[in-house]
Every structure is written in structure tokens, then in C-alpha cells.
UniProtKB/Swiss-Prot annotation:
Residues 1-42 are annotated as: Disordered. InterPro entries: Histone-fold (IPR009072), Histone_H2A/H2B/H3 (IPR007125), Histone_H3/CENP-A (IPR000164). It comes from Ajellomyces capsulatus. Core component of nucleosome. Nucleosomes wrap and compact DNA into chromatin, limiting DNA accessibility to the cellular machineries which require DNA as a template. Histones thereby play a central role in transcription regulation, DNA repair, DNA replication and chromosomal stability. DNA accessibility is regulated via a complex set of post-translational modifications of histones, also called histone code, and nucleosome remodeling. This is Histone H3. Disulfide bonds: none annotated. It is found in: Nucleus; Chromosome. The modification N6-methyllysine is found at residues 5, 10, 15, 19, 24, 28, 37, 80. The gene is HHT1. The modification Phosphoserine is found at residue 11.
Amino acid sequence: MARTKQTARKSTGGKAPRKQLASKAARKAAPSTGGVKKPHRYKPGAVALREIRRYQKSTELLIRKLPFQRLVREIAQDFKSDLRFQSSAIGALQESVEAYLVSLFEDTNLCAIHAKRVTIQSKDIQLARRLRGERS
């Protein structure tokens, strides 16, 4: 076979493989310890943000119906015994209570942000109620 002259070609910019450090090579060569896999963990705050988005989208009631009904009956007993409630009345009470709590927590969060915090505290709730005129 006749020898042919080789022509010069432009390089494609590929890099030559580099030598691995001894510690990396040792880590790759060593077998994994017992095959125990760590459970997957989300970054701090990621799950909380997902829950916030989920509950902001939803419209269902968040307080369970029967415990709320027992609480209403217990409070009503202090005013008059043997009171009866329509189920629609309990439902209306629960809707209004949850709407009140959501708006209170929104105002409480604003108070915490104003204090340059991200965690709400009892003093934030007290301030929000005081600004609303609910408590002197």
C-alpha cells in the first residue's frame, strides 16, 4: 500500500483527558458502604412554599367539620343550654371563621415582614389585632 501525504487539519477544540486526583480515584474505586441510600430531601423552605401555593389555590375548608361543630356547641353552652343548630348555620360559621383567620394571618405576616423577620410571633398577632381595632 502506498504511503500518502497527510494534510494539516484544524483541531475541533476537544480537550485531552486530564488525570484524576488520587482522592477522586480512590472514591470511585471504593465500593459503596452497604448500599444504604440516603432519602431524598428538598431544600429548606421548598415544601413550605409548595404548601402555600396549594392552599392558596384551594377553596375547601381547612378545619375539620366535626371538631369545629363540637367547639361551637361547647361555646354556645355558656350562653344557653339545649341550643340546636342547623347544619347550614355551622357551615356559615365555619366559612366566616376561616376567612377571618386567613385575613388575620395575612396581616400578621405583614407585621413580621415590617419587623424584618420571616417568622410570625404572638406579638405580630397582637399588633395586627390592635391596628384593626379589635383589642385595645
